[in-house]
Amino acid sequence: MHIKEMARRLQITPRAIRFYEEKGLVTPKKADGSGYRQFTEEDVWRLQTVITLREVGMSIEDIRQLLRQLDEGEGGLLHYLELQLSFVYDRWVELSKVIHTTEAMIARVKRDGESDPASLFELAEASKRLRLARSNWVDRWNFNQLAADYDKMVTESREGFNPHERYEQVLDALVEKVAPQPGETGLDAGTGTGNLARRLRERGATICAFDQSPEMLKRCRQKNPGVEAKLGTFFAFPFLDSRFDFVATSYALHHLTDEQKVLALAECRRVLKPAGRLAIADLMFTDADHRAQHLEALRQSGQTDVIERIEYEYYADRSRLLAALEELGFQPEAEQLTTYVHLVFARLA
């Protein structure tokens, strides 16, 4: 189709289409001889995605990066729609936090009878820090490229440092702890290739899942055709409030900073039903002293390469994780399963 027909279908001007073309967000083919732009159905959905993301406040550069990630993986209508939905959920969660902050400011002014600039500034700064923590995450592990070999990587036996030691047994222990029941609905947060989702589903529960990597999701869906798997992040679960009886996550939170982990736990809280359950199996140290002692022992034995690998990730401080869960209204407990993996289980009070 020509540019005028494209503009009519999308309810935008030809000038807007040319602008997005100049920015490299859409690249229509040129007709032989005439040089006129020829748009395809793929171009329609690509531009529709751009328009939607612009309407909810995403920058041109961020859209360009997201589209590039899609281009590197599997394209098509489904992925454009998933991208739109993921970002809309992200924006919704962010706006919900803005509403919460504003309501807290109003309540404080009503309570104190006058405006305290320092107090309001503190609330605004806290909101800003949370927003920055959500937006600063970068996939420096390149999970789309890891997807093809991920299952082999986590299950193969190896000598020396092995953060995925007893991987299968860890997942089994998590499933036993969260104890899915037929008729329940659960969420596998950061599902990866869907190994945990498969185990949860085998217990008879209805399972949903999300991951930020399209390639990981592709493999999850191949293993779990009955699972509702969505594109999403730990900062904005692509599901509505109070939907799940339990949330489970494995080997995912160590890709988030401590501040980002708290945001992820708050999202777990948001999507859980009253008395909901949360189970986390991930790389952790008991507390700061445990971490320091372990790294010093590695240093004394000359294993500087292991120290570098640990410090490249964000192994959790279990004591801080438990404190954050308590603050969110959970009753948490924890146990250590392997050298680096701990299992945290929590129930809403």
Regions found by a protein language model. Give the residues of each.
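Basic helix-turn-helix/winged-helix DNA-binding cores
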Residues: 1-61
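Short, charged amphipathic alpha-helical surface segments
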Residues: 65-127
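Conserved class I S-adenosyl-L-methionine
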Residues: 132-179
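Class I SAM-dependent methyltransferase SAM/SAH-binding core
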Residues: 185-189, 193-236
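A short acidic, Gly/Pro-enriched loop at the edge of an enzyme's catalytic core
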Residues: 235-247
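A short glycine-rich, Lys/Arg-flanked "PGG" loop and its adjoining helix->strand segment in the class I
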Residues: 262-274
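C-terminal alpha-helical "lid/dimerization" subdomain adjacent to the S-adenosyl-L-methionine
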Residues: 280-335
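Core SAM-dependent methyltransferase catalytic element
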Residues: 327-349
